[in-house]
Structure formats: structure tokens, C-alpha cells
């Protein structure tokens, strides 16, 4: 009886908890070092050294910042709604972390391998704006509230375009399962053109290149990265919805923001860059574990996130709205129609 209970209920539960904790630790380490890389790239563009004191070459700077945030005293404004004020950063961080449950970092390596993973990510990422709105409203200050309103408008504007991009990927791959989407990219445009072996030309970035560009730019807007950081807009709103936050609550907002950025880099990798597939189907590249290729591609996409931050000036609010509704929405909708018609009349899939 006890053995059956252990094997039927307790053992599978322990496996899920173990997978979740392992993913959480790896994800937090990846966020810490991508934040370090972001600061280093930003410093290099400005001809500075960046973090270089804590640990060798400054590699422990993110952990020093973590300790600094944790030991600080959290300050709650007198007029704030205390319950909502403290709940908002937990909502933001929890929703950002929960999306990673369905991300496959290698063949069969996912906490929950569900066949509607793409729909799950779209649904959860749409809810992340609530943490920002709660924080802005509960602060009882006009500057956080303005940042929260900008966030709501920005999320609505670019969520639609991202949705149409995902529709084109679903049409090409024929599945909402992220693992299947990656596997379909092993035989794509390059194979159709008669290349002798599978390569990066088979991935969706080539056949869906306009949607690849739209998704990348929309991901910047979705995660409030420059040049679309109108939620924070440091030169205008001081710190946007986080202006009244300090200590651990501020760190949780910051964590949620960077986890969402890494998620968008991972989604770009899965949808358009072949996930864990090597760039060439040759034995000496197939020998490298798939998770290594996945992490390298995520870091590559994040590098371009950082470069855009360094070189592109911030858009005005009206330019942001115009780009979302008058450019990206018609283009993405047209690409959905073109892709569907192409698949219907050619039978290519």
C-alpha cells in the first residue's frame, strides 16, 4: 500500500518539484549573468569598463546587488494600498517565472510538455501587465500611475502583432507544441531547395523573415526594452511604476522584467532559430549537447537586445502607438493571409 502510494503519487510529485527547482536555479543564474553581460555591453559602447570589482572581472556583481537589495529596508508610502503594493511585485515575478514551465531547452527537457505550450505562454504573458498596473495604482502617486497606464496601452498594442506572428508559425509547423515546432525546422526551406544536409537555412527565420523582424521588435516593446521603455522612461518618469519601490519588492519587479526578456529570447530561438538544433547537420556539431546550442542562441538574441538599447533612441509615445497599430498590425495580418494562401495552394508544409 505504501509502496503503491509512493510510486503512484509521491515519486512523480518529487520529480516535478525537482525539475522545477533545477529550472529555477538555472534560470536565475542565467538572468544574473545576462544582466552582467547587458551592463558590460552598455559600458563597452560608452568606452567604460563596466562591473569589474566584485569577483574576477566583476562576475559576482549581480550577486552583490542581490545582497544589497535584500538587506535594505522596504519603504511603503504612507498613502499606498499596502496589500496591493506588496502583492504587485510577487504577481509580476511569479507570472514571468511560470511561463518557463513549458519551454523545452532540449529534446524532452521541459517541466511540463503540453501540446498547447504556445497558447499557454501567450495567455500568461498577457497577464504580466497586471503586476505593473497594480504597482502603479497602489503607489498612490501620479508618476507610477502614468507608467502603469503606458504599460497597459503598450501591451495591448503589441500583443496583437505577436499573436499574428505566432499564427504564422503555427500554420507552418502545424502545431502549438513548442517541441514539434522545433522538430519541424529540421526540414524546411533549405531541404525544399535541395541542399544535401539540414542547416540553419531550414529554420523559420528564412521562410518567415518579415515575421521574424516583427516578432523581434514587438518583443522589445512587450518587455519594455529600449527604444520602447516608455513604462519606465527614466528621463521622464524617474522609474515609472517602480518609483515608490525599494529593497526586495523592487528586486522582484526587476527579476520579473529580466525573466520576461530571457523568455522572449528563448521564444525567438524556438520559433525562428531552430531551438536546440545545430546550425549544420554534421557529426562534429551533432556531438554538442542540444542545451548548449539553445543557450548560445538565447545569448545571441540577447546580445542584439542589448545592442538595440545602446544605439537606438527612445520612441515618442505617439510613434510607439503608430508603429504598433498602423505598421505592425497590417503587416502581420497580411503575412498570415499570404502564408495561409501559400500553404493551401502549394501544399508546402
Swiss-Prot record:
It comes from the Bacteria. One of its GO terms (cellular component) is plasma membrane. GO terms for biological process: aerobic respiration. One of its GO terms (molecular function) is NADH dehydrogenase activity. Keywords: Cell inner membrane, Cell membrane, Membrane, NAD, Quinone, Translocase, Transmembrane, Transmembrane helix, Ubiquinone. Its EC number is 7.1.1.-. It catalyses: a quinone + NADH + 5 H(+)(in) = a quinol + NAD(+) + 4 H(+)(out). NDH-1 shuttles electrons from NADH, via FMN and iron-sulfur (Fe-S) centers, to quinones in the respiratory chain. The immediate electron acceptor for the enzyme in this species is believed to be ubiquinone. Couples the redox reaction to proton translocation (for every two electrons transferred, four hydrogen ions are translocated across the cytoplasmic membrane), and thus conserves the redox energy in a proton gradient. This subunit may bind ubiquinone. Belongs to the complex I subunit 1 family. NCBIfam families: PRK06076.1-2 (NF004741), PRK06076.1-6 (NF004745). This is NADH-quinone oxidoreductase subunit H. It comes from Bartonella henselae (strain ATCC 49882 / DSM 28221 / CCUG 30454 / Houston 1) (Rochalimaea henselae).
